[in-house]
Amino acid sequence: MKKEKLRTENISFQYPGAATYALKDVSFSLFEGEWVSVIGQNGSGKSTLAKLLNGLFLPEAGTITVNDTMILSEETVWDVRKQIGMVFQNPDNQFVGTTVQDDVVFGLENIGMPREQMVERLNQALRLVRMEDFLNDEPHSLSGGQKQRVAIAGVLALQPSILILDEATSMLDPQGRREVVETVRQLVNEKGITVLSITHDLEEAAQSDRVIILNKGEILEEGTPEQIFKSSHMLQEIGLDVPFSVKIAELLKRNEILLQNTHLTMESLVNELWRLHSKK
């Protein structure tokens, strides 16, 4: 059984002066080596959730427990932040160093890590995101996807238990998004890192292990991408779309071309269509 890395129990939060709760009675768990995506409309509570998990806000009710022992509070917030690393949406706003290596070691320097250990962490983190060949490059020479991979490396160098991506691909072009998504999948599969992705991108969410739908501050649905994206009508009712491959599969079904599987990527859809064509 996988180890529970984070648990929220009935957490609620209301902004001062707001008539309604931004989050209400939200409960879920994250497990070791799992990638969970949180999706929902603007105003559904996604970004508020990210801020609560990292202690930028504290819940008005309920508890957040990290690594099964540490309950988030004013007294523990700095210890919690050592366990939870965050990457935000704008790659340019996160780059604080003059070169890639300066940026990755910035957090390590702030905690006074010995140089020998710092160099080891730097090289390890850059290898994990496949940016080791860009050690001395300046930020203006990098693409958006490369900058986000450096931002992820900077977080990984601190060795947190959980990585939170708060709309980390929303400002990237398609190639940049692919680079970041491939990096996240590699980190989860090969290193067992736990990832929570707050995202508008349903193609990205389709690549994760589990999807949580937030609607008006509450969890509406939770399940695997296959389970979630089968409910296309429910998603559309709350203003969400479905991956393009799911739309195409539904159109094929209406034309009596029945597929055996739910396809979350165009590649898998094309492969099944090719197999069907080959049987003719």
From Swiss-Prot:
Q: This protein's superkingdom?
A: Bacteria
Translocase found in the keyword field? yes
Is ATP-binding among the key words of this record? yes
Residues binding ATP: G40, Q41, N42, G43, S44, G45, K46, S47
Example of a GO MF term: ATPase-coupled transmembrane transporter activity
A GO cellular component annotated for this chain's UniProt record is: ATP-binding cassette (ABC) transporter complex
| UniProt keyword terms in alphabetical order | ATP-binding, Cell membrane, Membrane, Nucleotide-binding, Translocase, Transport
Write one Pfam family the protein is assigned to.
ABC_tran
Which parts of the chain are coiled coil?
none
What subcellular compartments does it reside in? Cell membrane
User: What are the EC numbers?
Assistant: 7.-.-.-
**Signal sequence segment:** none
Enzyme class, spelled out = translocase
Q: How does it sit in the membrane?
A: Peripheral membrane protein
Report domain ABC transporter positions. Answer: 6-241
Entry-linked NCBIfam families: ECF_ATPase_1, PRK13635.1, PRK13648.1
User: What family does this chain come from, according to its entry?
Assistant: Belongs to the ABC transporter superfamily. Energy-coupling factor EcfA family.
Subunit composition? Forms a stable energy-coupling factor (ECF) transporter complex composed of 2 membrane-embedded substrate-binding proteins (S component), 2 ATP-binding proteins (A component) and 2 transmembrane proteins (T component).
Q: What does this protein do?
A: ATP-binding (A) component of a common energy-coupling factor (ECF) ABC-transporter complex. Unlike classic ABC transporters this ECF transporter provides the energy necessary to transport a number of different substrates.
Protein name as it appears in the record = Energy-coupling factor transporter ATP-binding protein EcfA1
Question: In which organism is this protein found?
Answer: Bacillus anthracis
